[in-house]
Each structure stands twice: as C-alpha cells, then as structure tokens.
Amino acid sequence: MDKNMKKSVVTVGNRSAEPLFALSPRTVQSDKFWRWGDDNMMPYALSLMSRRSTTHRRIINDKADYIAGKGFSFDEQQPLLSQIVKQANGAGDSLREVICRLAFDKALMGNAFLEVVTDEAHSFLALYHQDASRCRVARDSKHIIMHHDWSAFKQEEAVTLPLYPTFERQEDGSLRSIIHYKEYEPMFTHYGVPKYIAGMGVSAVAYKTDCWNISRLDTSFQLSGVMMIDASADNEAEAERIVRMAEQRFAGNPGQVMFIVREGGESDNSRFIPVDSSNEGDWSQLHDQATSDIVIAHSWFRSLSGLDYSAGFSAERILHEYEVALNTVILAEQEELLAPVKRLLQEIVGVNASS
C-alpha cells in the first residue's frame, strides 16, 4: 500500500531585510557619464538614509539652516544687487533659498549644483539650484548631465550644461553654465563625498533601533517564539498554505515567530513556545551610542541639534558650541558657497558684492 510522505516545514516571519546603502546589486557602465556609486544611484541611497535616521536628518537640516542664516546684509544703495538678493531667478526664489538648498545638498550628498543663466549682453543674471541627485558628470569632465530618473536614463531626455566658467547657448537663446560644489575626498575625482561618510553604519544602527521600537509597538509587545502546528501536509505547497492560514489566525504579523508544521497525531499538540528576551537596556544603549557617533561623524555639536547632555541643557554650553561651529564650519561653508556667486555678480552684471 502506498503511503504519503509527510514533511515538516519551517518558515520564519519578518525575515526579509531592507536595503540601506544600495538600491541595486548591478554595476552601471556608460560612455556618457561618470557613474556616482557602483549602481550610479548613490544620491538616492544617501537620500533614503536621511529619511530613515532622525538624528542624521536633523543635523543635515540644522547645518543647512545655520549656513544659510536668516538672510544677507548688503548695500541697499545698489538696486541690482538688492533685486538679485530678493529674487535670484524667474521661479521667484530668493538668494537665501537658493543658498539654503545648496547647503542642504552639500551636507547630504557632498555635492551641490548651481545653474547660472544670462545672455550675450549680460543684461541679467539668474541663479537656479539644481537637485544634486539629478546631476552626473559627463565623460569629458567638462559638462554636467541632468536627468529626471537615472534608473531609466535616456539620452534624448537629458539636459547638458557646461561647467563654469564656460557658457553655452541654449535653444531659448540664453547662455547657461553650472557650478559644481563638492567635498574633497582622496581617491574621488568626479564627485565629492559627504563628511559623515564614516557614520553611515551608525546611521543605519539608529534607524534599525527605531524599527525595533516600532515593531514592538506594532505587535503590542507580544513575545516572539516558536509556533508548533500539528497538521498533515502531503507536500510543501500544502504546508505553506497551512502556515499562511496560521499567520492570518495570529494577527498576520505576530512579532518574530517561527512556524513549524509537523505531522499530526491522534491528539492536537499545537502550542506556542515563547522566547523571552530582556534586552531593552542593550538596545537603548546602542541607540544612544549611535546618536553620539552620528554627531561626531558630522563634525557637529549636540546642543545645536536639540540633543541634550547627561548634565542637561546649558545656555553657556550652547553659546560656546555655536561659537566653535561658527568659526570651524558655518563661516567656511558660507564663503565656499558665496565666492562663485560674488564672482558672477562682478563679471556678469558689474556688481561688487565683496562687502
């Protein structure tokens, strides 16, 4: 008499890992541009990480705000300069808004791009921020290629602009150029590297500890464990169906649960074996350490991003750290971003903005 072969099947809930640093395992090769990361999607990965780690994102936001400041002090007796400060381009952006976006891109991706628009008579000057994630360095290293979706690049949809100080005539008759700001990093020629690059790992740790807390809330702090199910399964497909039914029966996503389907006997011995783990303290300490390391990687200061010390907040400490940040980070970044703008004002519209 033929006997059906019974088979035990093991399945684990919540076992899929989310990518953190790469969006694709493939390596991109092109004779049109220099790739930014192996898959040419490094800006997307950096942006994704900034949306996942709260401390990491807060520091980037604060850096951009501190660098842009509340506005500019300038000679209001120069009407052309006043006009550019108040409205730097046809989109209605003020110069402060443009600089703030440049500072944000540079803090986040280590690169920033400023488009410059004028005409042959130099009768006007417009400055546009270009999203760094849309920009790639052309193979000749003299142009920047802009595309809306680098995961599906099409040459006919791209816009190419020359790197400053070269200008090229466009279809609308304007002369355009683009300035590439980048953070220096040895061994990297075409793109800059963000200063916090050594803190990518701890940013991921902070993100994962947040995920752990969220999963604990989603499961109402239910224990993880092993669910032993007595059921007869003729094949793997049948066993998988039984497991899926069990998952739906137990709230669909019951924490970290391992389901084991075994051949049933005369009596039903299905049971749940909890696995108790008292590691809240370890996770809390890990999160605190990751937060401290993120601040260090950014070359930033805790009190300037709303992070307290064990001794609590101190007005004197905040003022001291701001003074250090002003002289080591903020003023240097302001000068780096504004130096080309001052040069453009002098060369194109004859405005001296050195003061």
Regions found by a protein language model. Name each.
Residues I84, A88, L102, D230, ...:
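Generic structural signal for hydrophobic core residues of well-folded globular domains
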Residues K142-R169, E238-E316, E335-S354:
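Long amphipathic alpha-helical segments
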Residues S232, E236, E280, S284, ...:
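Hydrophobic alpha-helical scaffolding
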Residues G225-D230, S270-S277, R317-V324:
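Short, hydrophobic beta-strand segments
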Residues Y322-P340:
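Long, continuous compositionally biased terminal/linker segments
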Residues D2-G264:
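Structured, contiguous alpha/beta core segments that scaffold functional sites
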Residues G201-S203, G312-L319:
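A short small-residue
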